[in-house]
Amino acid sequence: MSQISMFVRKLHKFSYNPNYKFKCGLEIHTQLKTKYKLFSLSPTSYNEPPNTKLSYFDVGLPGTQPLLNPEALLLALKASVALNCDIQSYSSFDRKHYFYADQPLGYQITQHYYPLAKNGYVQLNKFDDMPDKVISLEQVQLEQDTGKTVNYDDRINVDLNRANTPLIEVVTKPDFENIDQVQAFVRKYQLLVSHLDICTGDLETGAIRVDANISVNNNPRVEIKNLGSSGEIVDALKYEYNRQVTLLQNNGKIIQETRGWNGIATESLRKKENAVDYRYVPDSELPVIRLDKNIQAQLQNTLDELPDSVLDRLTKEPYNLQLAHARNLLFQPEILDYYENIFGRIRDANKWFFHELLAAFAKSDVEFQVDIVLPDMLVDIVSSVEKNEISLTGARIILKHIIRNKSTKTLPQLIKELDIGKPEASAELEEAINEICQQIINTNADVVEKIARGHTNALQVLIGQAMKATKGKVHAKEFRSKFMELLK
């Protein structure tokens, strides 16, 4: 059996060896949601035809100079504050020299000597399904992305649309003691930057790319580059931990290197470079960034409510949501806004929102959209049920009709059109209810027999048929009462 096959088998039954301590740090590259690129006026582009969104500076044309995008700086500062970092009053840009086809300048503009922010932290906690754990951050730096190389027809093609896209690189300390903590941190980070509209938060599209530095028993660290999904992160770390443990058990030596993940195994890419190899020098074409000493407090006051705070609020009085429901709302800000709009305006808002409204969208196979069933419409529907103007079944019929037909009619118009208004109480109505119930009893002898044997849940079958026969005009409790009377 090859070494790779052996390691792959171990992935499926992974466990930590208590004699070999797992230690990991992350470098997270995050594309900022700006209109323009970091140092040019080219629009940021992710889905356009190759090499169509470029400026002379993006392609490294001699004589062109960089111009800092203030929107990118603001988003980087927002992220730094949200990550509990210390904003630096003085920061600057440096050139990181290396040659590769997707980097036309021959260097990357980054912040090596004086980064934008330092000394942050992220708190893992119950909202991440984790014990309390603080992950410390080294720094946050603003830098430019590279282009992309694409292998096609035995050629390497270069697409520079992504070149000079603004990034922040978040560097953690090696505080991760297991892979579950890594997963929880990445999920939390994704949620944070997407919630604050700093980044889309997508791993799969490359908006967030993760490099992991892993070591065992404080041996030299190995960097795994460009992990593009949660699954890749987990599998690559499991594989690399097993590889290093096996090497040490066989008296091998861990070398500091950069490795890639090919979907099955990590593979060596190059010996790990150090700062000298990159020949960092200050970028003389970009001025230093000097920030007011009050910038940290000012930014803190402008930030939206952070995810942990939202989850804490939603799981307490008066909302009392389950954590799973609160998370779902947090991941979908439009739905959260809708929920908070109707909460307090109707009784039992959680039942109506989750079990009636969202269920109606799901059953209709339609993605939730605020403008299909407006908050005021839902409030009116609930009010009509509470006033006994329509039944619960009638409300469900109306919701499904609006969703499936994108109806913009008023509630009274829908009640009339669908003929689901509750009939006026009268002797004739009582007689009609009695006749319907008796007819259903006569045609469902097997169900009646189950009820007689004590299977009271079977009564719902009869009630459901009665509700269907009356198109939901009569409340289920009235049918329940009549069936129980007739079946005594």
From Swiss-Prot:
PROSITE patterns the record matches: GATB (PS01234)
Source species, domain of life: Eukaryota
GO biological process: glutaminyl-tRNAGln biosynthesis via transamidation; mitochondrial translation
One Pfam family this sequence matches: GatB_Yqey
Comment field (misc): This protein may be expected to contain an N-terminal transit peptide but none has been predicted.
PANTHER family, per the entry: GLUTAMYL-TRNA GLN AMIDOTRANSFERASE SUBUNIT B MITOCHONDRIAL AND PROKARYOTIC PET112-RELATED, GLUTAMYL-TRNA(GLN) AMIDOTRANSFERASE SUBUNIT B, MITOCHONDRIAL
Name under which the protein is recorded: Glutamyl-tRNA(Gln) amidotransferase subunit B, mitochondrial
Origin species: Candida albicans (strain SC5314 / ATCC MYA-2876) (Yeast)
Gene symbol of the encoding locus: PET112
